[in-house]
């Protein structure tokens, strides 16, 4: 080894002769004595090049620049009194160099490595190997390593077996587009990269493995967001002879144990509340609510229906919904700020937004007067009606009530989005808190109005509630599913369900989704045949590793916790991928590139 110790030295190392190797983090010349901060993965330590100790070392010290790779030998000493640095773990000690060797020089980096400054993301991704040298990125990857290590150890202790499944599989589209791989040996035929190992892990249950997991790489050719990538990693799990309670207990223990092990400084709830899908949509406007703050959606349809406000009366008469949320402390918003909120509501599909300001002074609701109320709706609403709206939405004097009216689904979506965005704007979220919950009682199917057909809410392998089975023939939209999601801070971090394990029921679900028997046998025949050889009851779940590590690291994009991610256009800026390939490679695959028509 070219080093005997890491740079994470402490007072326990005083008097020890060490050989260190790393990168020059900073260099300072103090009148003939040169100080450098030497950095490796574990830490940073100050090294002194003093001519009284070694003139040759000083000459090398004069050559050093930021990011040079350096090996240095010396003795660990206490820093002189008054020169200690309490901001560094190694700030009480220094290394007096007696020998040094430049292992490699370095060009000037395109951005500062030694300062946590904002850098354009495209530049960071192009020079990702330099970006990872920065402390924030390095810490994120270490958190990821610790999280995955804990997951493996936890599941191993629970009797799970880690089994790898194929990356090249058959295309059986499950929602998003597949990434296709043309076969050279079978012209005109294609493999697909797995969107998840769903069918494979179910087949492992048929095979009698009972408890399976893997850290699975998955691929989806879909539009990107801050929390999505074309390739992503999930902790894939499946168990035989379990029900929902077993799986939810496993998830609760896994996530709480993981946080306690990897980020014990974070606040988190050890028991996960359970929220029905319907309640989540009605109270929070989405099926992955952020529970770190209130601002629940309040239904005021009855008040609007009996009020003198024509807009509200018409919506209520047509069977629509009228709902409100309270923006705390925003009663003083001016016309421009309120207009910004109105435009935000319109962006998400609302025809408009009705703000009601309860004045600028904080107070209690019983003291509210009409003189304090400012709104275009004020002349149509009585004071008692406004107080009731405020009471339901949790508003008080000094707050701003925001009301949306229209189709219930749209109202929930708009106010749910506004709730989340206002929480960020108003700093209502504790970044050091993880608020877990289970979302349950999902419907099995949802109606696709555009395609005029039923779709799976989760995926077609999710089992229906046994009590709802008769409804599959008469009213599929009312069939409940045995699905369970884990949500945290506004993200779905794990989705799971008890699976269908009977061939006839699975075929029936496929029929409801619009597949005919020929399509079913061609795409899923292998699974249905396996179910005929004694498939056990089974269930599973798949926590998204990228997304949960993002929350553990306090980041807002999964790109911050992936070593070499794609950008938001699904491009790899470091390697320049996707790229043009050699014509011979295309010919060998028996395919032809068709230029897009302008």
UniProtKB/Swiss-Prot annotation:
Pfam families: GAD (PF02938), tRNA-synt_2 (PF00152), tRNA_anti-codon (PF01336)
UniProt site positions, description: Important for tRNA non-discrimination: 30, 82
Keyword presence, Transmembrane helix: no
Keyword annotations of the record: Aminoacyl-tRNA synthetase, ATP-binding, Cytoplasm, Ligase, Nucleotide-binding, Protein biosynthesis
Subcellular location: Cytoplasm
Residues that bind L-aspartate: 174, 220, 458, 499
Cellular component GO terms held in the UniProt record: cytoplasm
Protein EC: 6.1.1.23
Gene3D superfamilies listed in its UniProt record: Bira Bifunctional Protein, Domain 2 (3.30.930.10), GAD-like domain (3.30.1360.30), Nucleic acid-binding proteins (2.40.50.140)
Protein residues bound to ATP: 220-222, 229, 492, 544-547
Molecular function, one GO term: aspartate-tRNA(Asn) ligase activity
InterPro entries: Aa-tRNA-synt_II, aa-tRNA-synth_II, aa-tRNA-synth_II/BPL/LPL, Asp-tRNA-ligase_1, Asp-tRNA-ligase_1_N, Asp/Asn-tRNA-synth_IIb, AspRS_core, GAD-like_sf
A GO BP annotation: aspartyl-tRNA aminoacylation
Alphabetical list of CDD domains matching this protein: AspRS_core, EcAspRS_like_N
Reaction it catalyzes: tRNA(Asx) + L-aspartate + ATP = L-aspartyl-tRNA(Asx) + AMP + diphosphate
Region described as Aspartate: spans on this chain: 198-201
SUPFAM superfamilies linked to this entry: Class II aaRS and biotin synthetases (SSF55681), GAD domain-like (SSF55261), Nucleic acid-binding proteins (SSF50249)
Keyword field contains Transmembrane helix: no
HAMAP family: Asp_tRNA_synth_type1
Function of the protein: Aspartyl-tRNA synthetase with relaxed tRNA specificity since it is able to aspartylate not only its cognate tRNA(Asp) but also tRNA(Asn). Reaction proceeds in two steps: L-aspartate is first activated by ATP to form Asp-AMP and then transferred to the acceptor end of tRNA(Asp/Asn).
Family: Belongs to the class-II aminoacyl-tRNA synthetase family. Type 1 subfamily.
NCBIfam families the record matches: aspS_bact (TIGR00459), PRK00476.1 (NF001750)
Assembly and interaction partners: Homodimer.
Protein name (record): Aspartate--tRNA(Asp/Asn) ligase
């Amino acid at each position: 080894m070219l080093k005997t110790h890491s740079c994470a030295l402490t007072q326990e190392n005083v008097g020890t002769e060490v050989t260190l190797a790393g990168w020059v983090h900073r260099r300072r010349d103090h009148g003939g004595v040169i100080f450098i901060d030497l950095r490796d993965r574990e830490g940073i330590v100050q090294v002194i090049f003093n001519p009284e100790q070694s003139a040759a070392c000083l000459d090398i010290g004069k050559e050093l620049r930021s990011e040079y790779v350096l090996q240095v030998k010396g003795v660990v000493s206490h820093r002189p009194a008054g020169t200690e640095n309490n901001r560094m773990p190694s700030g009480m000690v220094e290394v007096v160099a007696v020998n040094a060797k430049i292992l490699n020089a370095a060009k000037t980096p395109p951005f500062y490595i030694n300062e946590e400054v904002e850098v354009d993301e495209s530049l960071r991704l192009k020079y990702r190997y330099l970006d990872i040298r920065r402390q924030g990125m390095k810490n994120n990857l270490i958190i990821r390593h610790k999280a995955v290590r804990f997951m493996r150890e936890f599941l191993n202790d629970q009797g799970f077996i880690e089994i790898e499944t194929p990356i090249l599989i058959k295309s059986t589209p499950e929602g998003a587009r597949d990434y296709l791989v043309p076969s050279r040996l079978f012209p005109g035929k294609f493999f697909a990269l797995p969107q998840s190992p769903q069918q494979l892990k179910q087949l492992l249950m048929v095979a009698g493995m009972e408890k399976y997991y893997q850290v699975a790489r998955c691929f989806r050719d879909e539009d990107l967001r801050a929390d999505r990538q074309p390739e992503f990693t999930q902790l894939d799990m499946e168990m035989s002879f379990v029900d929902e309670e077993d799986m939810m207990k496993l998830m609760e223990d896994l996530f709480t144990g993981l946080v306690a092990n990897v980020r014990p400084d974070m606040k988190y709830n050890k028991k996960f509340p359970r929220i029905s899908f319907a309640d989540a949509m009605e109270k929070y406007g989405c099926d992955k609510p952020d529970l770190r703050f209130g601002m629940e959606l309040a239904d005021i349809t009855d008040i609007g229906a009996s009020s003198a406000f024509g807009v509200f009366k018409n919506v209520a008469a047509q069977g629509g919904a009228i709902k409100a949320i309270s923006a705390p402390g925003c009663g003083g918003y001016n016309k421009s700020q309120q207009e910004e909120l109105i435009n935000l509501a319109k962006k998400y599909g609302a025809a408009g937004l009705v703000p009601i300001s309860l004045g600028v002074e904080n107070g209690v609701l019983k003291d509210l007067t009409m003189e304090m109320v400012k709104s275009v709706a004020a002349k149509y609403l009585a004071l008692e009606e406004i107080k009731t709206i405020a009471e339901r939405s949790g508003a008080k004097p000094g707050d701003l009530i925001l009301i949306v009216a229209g189709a219930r689904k749209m109202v929930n979506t708009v106010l749910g989005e506004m709730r989340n965005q206002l929480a960020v704007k108003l700093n209502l979220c504790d970044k050091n808190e993880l608020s877990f919950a289970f979302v349950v009682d999902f419907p099995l199917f949802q109606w696709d109005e555009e395609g005029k057909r039923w779709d799976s809410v989760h995926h077609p392998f999710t089992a229906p509630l046994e009590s709802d089975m008769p409804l599959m023939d008469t009213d599929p939209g009312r069939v409940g599913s045995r699905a369970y999601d884990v949500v945290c801070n506004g993200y779905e971090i794990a989705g799971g369900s008890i699976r269908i394990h009977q061939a006839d029921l699975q075929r029936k679900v496929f029929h409801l989704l619009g597949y005919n028997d020929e399509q079913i046998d061609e795409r899923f025949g292998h699974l249905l045949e396996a179910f005929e050889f004694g498939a056990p009851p089974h269930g599973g779940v798949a926590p998204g590793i990228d997304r949960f590590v993002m929350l553990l690291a306090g980041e807002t994009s999964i790109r911050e916790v992936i070593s070499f991610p794609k950008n938001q256009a699904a491009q790899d800026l470091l390697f320049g991928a996707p790229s043009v390939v050699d014509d011979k490679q295309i010919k060998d695959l028996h395919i032809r590139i068709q230029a897009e028509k302008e």
